[in-house]
C-alpha cells in the first residue's frame, strides 16, 4: 500500500507540472483574462509605488533586484533586533543578538531559511508575520521574476521590468495559491491563531505549555516558495506543522509545483516545447535515482546496528516520525533537497551515510530541479555547457536556441560554475582550520566533516536544511553562513542574467543538417552526463572523505 501511495504522489508531481507551467507563461507574458482579474490591483500598486512599466537593461534589472532585496534585509534586521519592545509578543521574547539577526534576515531574504534559532522560542508573532512571512513571499517572487527575464533574454526578447515581474509573481502566483492551500492546511489540522500558548494538563498530571500561532499561513508559503523554514524548531516533524500523511503529501506537492513547472514555461516562451519536456524528463530521472538510493539505504537499516542482530524490518527509524514512516521520510528528504526547500520531516543528521549522501548531492548539483527560479537558471547553465562540450567534440561552433555560444558567454558561465564549489569548499576549509568551526561538531571523524560541508552547501544553494547535530548558533557560524548565503544567491543570478542579455542581442543562425538538436533524447543524455561530470565530480573527493568513508567504516 505504501508504494501505491508513493507512485500516486509521483504522478501528482508530473500531472500538475505542465498546467502550472502554462499558467506561469500566461501570468508573465500577458493574458487578457488574467490582466482583467489582476490588472486593476497591480496598476494601483504601481501608482502608489511610482513604478513605471518600461523595459530595463540587464544591469538595471539586476540593480533593481539587489537594491530592493538589500532594503528588505535592513528593515527586517531591525524588526528582529527590536522585537522585544514591539507588539504581538505574548511570550515576551527578547530581541535577537546582532549576528543572529544578520544571519536570519539574509537567510529568509535569500530563500534559504537557515535557522540558528528555534522558531517558537526565538521570534515574536510580529517577527513571524511581518519579518519572516513577508520575506517568504518576497524571496521566491524575486527569483521567479528574474527567471522570467532570463528566459525572455534567451528567447531574444526584451528582459522586461523587475518591479512589474516582482509584483505579478506576488499577485498572480504566490498570494492566491498560498491563500487557498493555507485553508486546506487548516482543514487538515494545522492551527491558525494569534493567541498565545495554552497550558494543558498531561495524563500524569504535569502542566505543559503548548505553543501555537499563525502556522497554516506560514506553512503554505514555506513550501510553495521553496523557503523551508519552520514555525517550530523541529520544522515539519512537528504535528502542528505537518499533522499526517495528507498534509505531508500536500507539502511535497507544493515544494515541487513551481520548479517542475518552469521547464514547460521555458519551452513555451522560447518556442520549443519539446526542449522543455526533455529537460523535465531528464531531471525527473535523476530525481528518481536519488529517491531509490536513499530509500534503499534507509530500508536496509544502519549497518552497525544490523551487525548486532537488532531487528530492522522498518529500516533505519532513528530521527523519523512514525506517522510518516521510512519510505515517505526518504521521499520528503529527496524532494526538499531537490527543490532546494530545506523543510524536513525527519532529522537529516540521523540518516544512514548513503541516505545522507543523497540530500547532500542534490544540493551540490542544485539542478534537480532547484529552487523557484534560481534552480532553473542553473539548469540552463548546465544545458549550455552540454551544448558547448558537444560542439567542441564535433568541431562546430556551439549553438543554443539558434544562437552561437562564444567566449563572452562561456567566461561568465565558467566563473558561475566555479564560484559555487569555491564557496562551499573554501568556507568548509576555513571552519575546519579553526576551533571556532570544529568546536561545533557533535560527531568527530567522517560524520563531523559531513556536518560542516552540509551546512555550507545548504547555505550556498539556499536550501536551509542542516545536519542539526552541528552547534551552529554561534557568532562564527552566523557570520560565515550569512556571507555564503548572500554570495551564493546573488552572484550566479547576476552573471547568468548577463549571459541571457548577451544572447538576446545575437541573431538566430538558421538550422542545418549539422545543427546539434537540444530537443531529443541524445541531448537529454548528454545533459545528465554534464551534470554528473561537471557537478558531482567536483565534490567527489569530499564525498569520499565524508559519507562514503563513514559508510565503509560502518560496513
UniProtKB/Swiss-Prot annotation:
Listed transmembrane segments: 2-22, 60-80, 130-150, 173-193, 246-266, 278-298, 374-394, 412-432, 483-503, 525-545
InterPro entries named among the record's database cross-references: KdpA (IPR004623)
UniProt GO molecular function: P-type potassium transmembrane transporter activity; potassium ion binding
Bilayer disposition of the protein: Multi-pass membrane protein
GO cellular component: plasma membrane
Disulfide-bond pairs as recorded: none
Keyword Transport on entry: yes
Location in or out of the cell: Cell membrane
Alphabetic keyword roster: Cell membrane, Ion transport, Membrane, Potassium, Potassium transport, Transmembrane, Transmembrane helix, Transport
Record keyword DNA damage present: no
Family: Belongs to the KdpA family.
Job description of the protein: Part of the high-affinity ATP-driven potassium transport (or Kdp) system, which catalyzes the hydrolysis of ATP coupled with the electrogenic transport of potassium into the cytoplasm. This subunit binds the extracellular potassium ions and delivers the ions to the membrane domain of KdpB through an intramembrane tunnel.
Record's subunit section: The system is composed of three essential subunits: KdpA, KdpB and KdpC.
Protein name stated in the entry: Potassium-transporting ATPase potassium-binding subunit
Source lineage: Bacteria, Bacillati, Bacillota, Bacilli, Bacillales
This protein's encoding gene: kdpA
Amino acid at each position: 500500500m505504501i508504494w501505491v501511495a508513493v507512485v500516486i504522489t509521483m504522478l501528482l508531481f508530473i500531472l500538475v507540472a505542465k498546467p502550472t507551467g502554462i499558467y506561469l507563461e500566461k501570468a508573465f507574458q500577458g493574458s487578457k483574462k488574467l490582466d482583467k482579474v489582476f490588472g486593476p490591483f497591480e496598476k494601483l500598486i504601481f501608482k502608489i509605488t511610482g513604478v513605471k512599466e518600461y523595459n530595463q537593461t540587464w544591469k538595471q534589472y539586476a540593480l533593481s533586484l539587489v537594491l530592493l532585496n538589500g532594503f528588505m534585509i535592513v528593515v527586517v534586521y531591525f524588526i528582529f533586533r527590536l522585537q522585544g519592545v514591539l507588539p504581538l509578543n505574548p511570550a515576551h521574547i527578547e530581541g535577537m543578538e546582532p549576528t543572529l539577526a544578520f544571519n536570519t534576515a539574509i537567510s529568509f531574504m535569500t530563500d534559504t531559511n537557515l535557522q540558528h534559532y528555534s522558531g517558537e522560542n526565538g521570534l515574536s508573532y510580529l517577527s513571524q508575520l511581518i519579518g519572516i512571512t513577508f520575506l517568504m513571499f518576497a524571496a521566491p517572487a524575486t527569483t521567479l521574476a528574474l527567471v522570467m527575464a532570463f528566459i525572455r533574454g534567451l528567447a531574444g526578447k526584451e528582459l522586461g521590468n523587475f518591479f512589474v515581474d516582482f509584483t505579478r509573481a506576488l499577485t498572480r502566483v504566490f498570494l492566491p495559491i498560498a491563500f487557498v492551500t493555507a485553508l486546506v492546511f487548516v482543514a487538515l489540522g494545522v492551527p491558525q491563531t494569534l493567541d498565545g500558548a495554552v497550558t494543558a494538563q498531561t495524563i500524569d498530571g504535569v502542566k505543559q505549555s503548548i505553543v501555537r500561532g499563525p502556522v497554516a499561513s506560514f506553512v503554505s508559503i514555506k513550501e510553495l516558495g521553496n523557503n523551508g523554514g519552520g514555525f517550530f524548531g523541529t520544522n515539519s516533524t512537528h504535528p502542528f506543522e505537518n499533522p499526517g500523511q495528507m498534509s505531508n503529501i500536500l507539502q511535497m506537492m507544493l515544494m515541487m509545483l513551481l520548479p517542475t513547472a518552469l521547464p514547460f514555461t521555458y519551452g513555451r516562451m522560447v518556442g520549443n516545447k519539446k526542449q522543455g519536456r526533455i529537460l523535465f524528463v531528464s531531471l525527473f530521472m535523476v530525481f528518481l535515482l536519488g529517491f531509490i538510493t536513499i530509500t534503499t539505504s534507509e530500508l536496509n537499516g544502519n549497518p552497525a546496528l544490523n551487525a548486532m542482530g537488532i531487528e530492522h524490518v522498518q529500516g533505519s527509524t532513528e530521527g523519523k516520525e512514525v506517522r510518516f514512516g521510512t519510505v515517505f521520510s526518504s521521499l520528503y528528504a529527496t524532494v526538499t533537497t531537490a527543490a532546494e526547500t530545506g523543510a524536513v520531516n525527519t532529522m537529516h543528521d540521523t540518516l544512514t551515510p548513503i541516505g545522507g549522501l543523497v540530500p547532500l548531492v542534490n544540493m551540490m548539483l542544485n539542478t534537480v530541479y532547484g529552487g523557484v527560479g534560481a534552480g532553473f537558471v542553473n539548469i540552463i547553465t548546465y544545458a549550455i555547457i552540454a551544448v558547448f562540450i558537444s560542439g567542441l567534440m564535433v568541431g562546430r561552433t556551439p549553438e543554443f536556441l539558434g544562437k552561437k555560444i562564444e567566449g563572452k558567454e562561456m567566461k561568465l558561465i565558467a566563473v558561475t560554475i566555479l564560484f559555487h564549489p569555491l564557496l562551499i569548499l573554501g568556507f568548509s576549509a576555513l571552519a575546519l582550520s579553526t576551533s571556532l568551526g570544529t568546536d561545533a561538531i557533535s560527531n568527530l571523524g567522517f560524520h563531523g566533516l559531513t556536518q560542516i560541508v552540509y551546512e555550507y552547501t545548504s547555505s550556498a544553494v539556499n536550501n536551509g536544511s542542516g545536519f542539526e547535530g552541528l552547534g551552529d548558533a554561534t557568532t562564527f557560524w552566523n557570520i560565515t553562513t550569512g556571507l555564503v548565503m548572500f554570495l551564493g544567491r546573488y552572484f550566479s543570478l547576476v552573471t547568468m542574467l548577463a549571459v541571457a542579455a548577451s544572447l538576446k542581442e545575437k541573431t538566430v543562425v538558421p538550422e542545418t543538417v549539422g545543427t546539434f538538436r537540444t530537443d531529443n533524447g541524445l541531448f537529454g543524455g548528454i545533459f545528465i552526463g554534464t551534470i554528473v561530470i561537471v557537478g558531482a565530480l567536483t565534490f567527489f573527493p569530499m564525498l569520499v572523505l565524508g559519507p562514503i568513508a563513514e559508510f565503509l567504516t560502518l560496513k
